[in-house]
């Protein structure tokens, strides 16, 4: 309530972390909880505000939308019916992951989100157990593959290029929960151009590059 009384706007999440500090997060940039302390953070540590000594201290981070922008009504993503019948599967890469053991069929599965590790890389050892081969298998079954957990940069590994060449579509600079939510919304809407919804911001979920 203090955030609203202070003039705060938008779809927000307040949470007190284990250090006793209470932050106000933009909901679409909330990351997964830290399992060691059960703390929540904002993507890029760009919080909307902090509640300190009974007062709301708004952030001046340039990567955040202004309160004026947050107060503007947004158009809906679809004019038709919206049912979450299409499923989105979430996978997380780790060194040595054998993708050949995974079988994703089209039974209500529309897409796979694969969370990459360091600088957007994933297992690409060749043979039949790398992510590129997994992408090929998914596409044969009518399932699209997306990558999350990466930012847009010209400096990428050759393995990352190989993954892109096998049809994996990157979702840049959004949290993993936001990436999954966008895909669920896209594949369960009446939109014909799903890529447009995925590449565009719905509600400020994409984190802009930090100004230098």
What are these regions (language model features)?
Residues 12-16, 92, 115, 148-149:
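Short beta-strand segments
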Residues 21-125, 211-212:
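Accessory alpha-helical/coil subdomains and C-terminal extensions
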Residues 18, 95, 152:
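Short, glycine/serine-rich, charged loops/turns that create anion-binding
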Residues 119-212:
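C-terminal non-catalytic interaction/assembly regions of soluble proteins
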Residues 7, 86, 105, 114, ...:
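Functionally constrained cores in energy, signaling, and assembly domains
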Residues 3, 105, 137-138:
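Hydrophobic helix-cap positions at the C-terminus of alpha-helices
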Residues 1-39, 46, 174-211:
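A charged, well-structured terminal subsegment
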């Amino acid at each position: 309530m203090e955030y609203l009384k202070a003039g705060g706007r938008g779809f927000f999440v307040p949470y007190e972390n284990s250090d006793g500090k209470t932050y106000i997060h933009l909901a679409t940039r909330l990351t997964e909880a830290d399992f060691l302390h059960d703390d929540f953070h904002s993507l890029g540590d760009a919080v909307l505000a902090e509640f300190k000594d009974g007062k709301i201290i708004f952030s001046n981070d340039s990567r955040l939308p202004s309160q004026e922008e947050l107060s503007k009504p947004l158009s809906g993503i679809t004019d038709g019916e919206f049912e979450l019948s299409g499923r989105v599967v979430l996978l997380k890469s780790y060194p040595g992951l054998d993708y050949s053991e995974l079988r994703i069929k089209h039974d209500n599965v529309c897409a796979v989100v694969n969370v990459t590790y360091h600088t957007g890389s994933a297992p690409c050892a060749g043979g039949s157990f790398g992510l590129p081969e997994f992408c090929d298998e998914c596409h044969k079954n009518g399932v699209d593959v997306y990558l999350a957990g990466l930012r847009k940069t010209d400096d990428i590994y050759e393995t990352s290029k190989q993954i892109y060449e096998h049809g994996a579509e990157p979702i840049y600079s959004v949290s993993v929960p936001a990436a999954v939510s966008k895909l669920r919304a896209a594949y369960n809407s009446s939109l014909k151009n799903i890529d447009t919804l995925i590449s565009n911001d719905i509600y400020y979920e994409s984190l802009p590059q930090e100004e230098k």
